Amino acid sequence: MLELKTHRLAIPIVLFAGLLWSFGPLVVRYMDNPNQVPWQYIFGRGLTIFILLNLYLYFEEGFNFYKNYKKVGKSGLLGGCGLGVAMISFIYSITNTTAAITLLCLAAMPFFTALLAFLFLKERISLNVWISIIVATIGIIIMALGNTEKSSIIGFIFGITSSIGFSVFSVTLRWRKETPKFTTVAIAGLFCFVVATFMILIKNQPFFATSFNSSMFSLHGTLVCLGLILYSIGSKAIPAAELTLLSLTEVIGGIFWVWLPLFGINEIPSTNTIVGGFFLFVSITYYSLIMRWNKRYIALN
């Protein structure tokens, strides 16, 4: 894999990865009635992610890439399932509430990760991180209080579930650091594909939606894969603190694209979402400053 050792080159690459991911909510909003074909979306997106990541691994490592599957172990399977649940929850969240709610729930992932690592890996949480978690929790509660409609509450719950699923993936990587990251994500794609296949058969539905929707499903999967590859290249040269801040590109961009009248969606966040989001951004910024002081580095290998 291409490795960047200079901070100056790594930052724009990670920013571009976040920019690619930020178009995900816009792609979903352009779909025709995605709430009526969630399993077809999960089927198409999961299959796209599985195929593209295996192709990338093949070109990166040659035919021996399949040996990565022998190395995943329990951590890889658990992480893949956690990530798969996150992907499934994402579509149910964003089709039942605003993109802002879904994305801000995902922005709380570092704090769920810290709590899970504390519970299962016995990682110590400092007082400053607890402060960040409390501030983030206040923001999440404020957003939850603004979701009074039944469908919006369901979307919020699925958004939190998606964030926890991503956190499970992150914690499993800490649990066993030699777990192949890309292979674990490919397993998540396969998990989505298998679960969606099962649900489609039970519901006696077609596997594919309209040609337009199917292309949107694959486009979203492609954006996820390309962003992941670029993120993995740039993340090796960037401290975790800066990565946390740079990851906000996805959140800010995702909210901005669905609001921008140019794209025809014009989805405006509610007051509670804006206030709760402000608390989340404050907590993430504070958390990033703490991480910077600790000089911690993370990366996808």
Task: Name each model-derived stretch.
Residues 9-17, 57, 64-89, 128, ...:
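Loop-to-transmembrane-helix transition segments
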Residues 3-4, 46, 145, 248-301:
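C-terminal-most transmembrane helix of multi-pass membrane proteins
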Residues 2-4, 49-70, 136-151, 191-213, ...:
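Membrane-interface helix-cap regions at the ends of transmembrane helices
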Residues 22, 26, 80, 84-88, ...:
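Hydrophobic/small/kink-forming positions within alpha-helical transmembrane segments
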Residues 18, 44, 102-108, 173-192, ...:
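Helix-helix packing/entry segments at the starts of transmembrane helices
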Residues 53, 116, 125-145, 164, ...:
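Hydrophobic transmembrane alpha-helices of multi-pass small-molecule transport proteins
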Residues 34-85, 112, 165-169, 186-203, ...:
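Transmembrane alpha-helices of multi-pass small-molecule transport proteins
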Residues 1-44, 81, 148-175, 216, ...:
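Glycine-/small-residue-enriched transmembrane alpha-helix faces in small-molecule transporters
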